[in-house]
Amino acid sequence: MNKLSTKLVVAIGIGAALYGILGLWGFSIAPNTFIKPALAILTVFGALFGPVAGLLIGLIGHTVTDTIAGWGIWWGCYPTLLNCPLH
């Protein structure tokens, strides 16, 4: 298994921070259509640094967005499997 280089770890940190903060904003161009410019950051970083970086940036950045926005961390909360309360 390859180790993560310092360059890749820094790119993941910067990408996740940008994606997490900018993921809070977007704009509507038509009814039921919402565009988030932060998705471009995820696409560019994934193309430049590879799929592992893209996966980690998306996972960490989306968790940051959900936490800052007050929606909370949702993954792993399936009441039928884990008896986890949804409220």
Swiss-Prot record:
Keywords: Cell membrane, Membrane, Transmembrane, Transmembrane helix. The chain crosses the membrane at residues 9-29, 40-60. It is found in: Cell membrane. The keyword Transmembrane applies. InterPro entries: ECF_substrate-spec-like. Belongs to the UPF0397 family. This is Putative UPF0397 protein BC_2624. The lineage of its organism: Bacteria, Bacillati, Bacillota, Bacilli, Bacillales.
